[in-house]
């Protein structure tokens, strides 16, 4: 499911995504009759960082603090926690990526790397009744992973500083697990965790919502 201009949806529509993103199902009650429907999907949402769209460009944004706060308040903590990855991309970064073409992988090379990773993933999860790492429960994740002391310290520091929540911690571990599989490693290393954390960039949102409290 691809939702463009995510912030243009009504708050109640955004919040209604919480159950299907968490459980892979949706419950509907009509005329006293209860129905549960499957709703296991991958959600990709895009949005501008502020109403004018230039919130990540230094000196260009025309929005006031209150306009930004009102705009971003639709993104509740529980909704953010249900995204595995939150990426910010400024125009400067996008232009740089367009230029950096030399030495990049071809589509066929990327496809082969992904297929190899999927095979490793299936082998790893064969005893967990999961199709992929994203479907691992908190209990299954803890049983599967044996984190080093250094990895645990990295997560603890991030949690204590308020950078991540408990649910967000599971998301980071799942992304780190995928990175581990892509690099054909047998355990999650600190560098895998640090990379996974860079793919969970909610700083610009928290900065606006928490400023001036």
Task: Go through each PLM region and give its residues.
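Basic, amphipathic alpha-helical bundle interface domains used for macromolecular binding and assembly
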Residues: 12-213
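Conserved nucleotide-sensing/catalytic segment adjacent to the nucleotide-binding pocket
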Residues: 1, 11
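Catalytic or ion-coupling anion/metal-binding cores of large enzyme and transporter domains
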Residues: 8
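Walker B catalytic acidic pair
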Residues: 4-5, 16
